[in-house]
Regions:
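Bacterial N-terminal signal peptides that target proteins for export
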Residues: 1-10
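Hydrophobic alpha-helical transmembrane segments of integral membrane proteins
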Residues: 15-16
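N-terminal acidic, glycine/proline-rich low-complexity segments
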Residues: 23-340
Length: 340
């Protein structure tokens, strides 16, 4: 018995000497229609505060149904300037933050026109080229495309890739991409799903208006009051008084760029929140659930093939004040006290 204990101790000590290898960060490229309403600017502040948690491959200004022309790369750069002022403070708390210069180098503007009218021969943009350059890196990790507005910059990138590459090369490119889009904010998302059925795509399909947003999983971030689709659990954490006290006022130049909410707080944040390595493993499969919500892969109505989306099987049930609440939004709001 004594020798067995000694053997166990030696094995434990040997294991302790093995170098610890940190988990690889997820790669992410953001497409944002910043300026049309406050929540994109709110989400960008959070994205930058967590910039040490992933490898940022691009920050691309785009159009959407709410911003049909003049993508605002200048607003991205304004937030990056503020990030540069606070980075020294951020690195006191955690390592891995990119420099302001590194982030400025991957900022770009996508398609200047709304939807599929901006996609076609000779319409490539700095944003679509940045996306392809990131995807073409000799890196085995997937490239997450976090779409906060319209999807036509991704559509242009894949339009160009299909025209210029062999079917085998295109297949390899598609296999590297993982898309999470905040509903359908132009007609390019539908086109992408029709033309590239193998593309990994998370979406709560919708018209290009807001009429179906109340059903979308992503509204669980803070949409309880505006969309009337949640029991307001810990809602004070996502409302203006808390945001002003804990982010906006007296929290430095980056916090000062966080606007008061007008509709919901950070509606675009679910598209990247699950990429933070918090132990829930969401990036491995959206079916696991986590800060980015829970999704299932199936062929919903009007889709031509399975996508990652909402269904009766992606809902969580939680008890609130003695009552059961079941919804897809619950897969996000259940974590509200943790992500705030």
């Amino acid at each position: 018995m004594k020798s067995n204990c000694v053997g166990c101790l030696l094995l434990f000590l040997a294991a302790a000497l093995i170098p610890f290898t940190a988990l690889a960060k997820e790669r992410v490229l953001v497409l944002t229609d910043m300026s049309n309403e406050p929540d994109d600017e709110e989400s960008m502040v959070r994205f930058l505060v967590y910039a040490n948690e992933y490898d940022v491959e691009g920050l691309v200004a785009t159009t959407s149904t709410w911003l049909r022309e003049r993508p605002r790369e200048d607003l991205i750069r304004r937030q990056l300037d503020a990030y540069g002022l606070v980075r020294d403070n951020l690195v006191k708390h955690a390592g891995g933050y990119p420099t302001m210069e590194q982030l400025l180098a991957v900022a770009a503007t996508g398609q200047p026109t709304y939807g599929m009218a901006g996609v076609g021969e000779g319409k490539s943009s700095a944003g679509s080229r940045r996306l392809l350059a990131a995807a073409d890196k000799p890196d085995a990790r997937p490239l997450w495309i976090s779409i906060w507005g319209g999807a036509n910059t991704l559509a242009q990138a894949l339009h160009d890739a299909r025209r210029e590459r062999s079917p085998e090369e295109l297949h390899k490119l598609i296999a590297k991409l993982k898309v999470y889009t905040i509903s359908d904010q132009d007609d390019a998302g539908r086109w992408l799903r029709l033309e590239f059925p193998d593309l990994f795509y998370i979406v709560s399909p919708s018209t290009t208006g807001h009429q179906e947003y109340h059903r979308a999983t992503w509204t669980g971030i803070s949409g309880d009051r505006h969309y009337r689709n949640g029991p307001m659990v810990d809602f004070e954490l996502v409302d203006n008084p808390w945001l002003e006290a804990n982010i906006i006022r007296n929290h430095g130049p980056l916090g000062a760029l966080y606007p008061r909410l007008a509709y919901i707080m950070e509606g675009d944040t679910p598209s990247f929140l699950g990429l933070i390595d918090n132990g829930l493993g969401w990036a491995a499969s959206p079916a696991y659930g986590g800060w980015g919500g829970r999704y299932v892969r199936y062929q919903s109505y009007a889709e031509t093939h399975p996508i990652w989306t909402d269904s009766s099987d992606n809902r969580d049930t939680l008890m609130v004040d003695g009552k059961a609440h079941t919804s897809s939004q619950a897969t996000i709001w259940r974590w509200r006290r943790h992500y705030q």
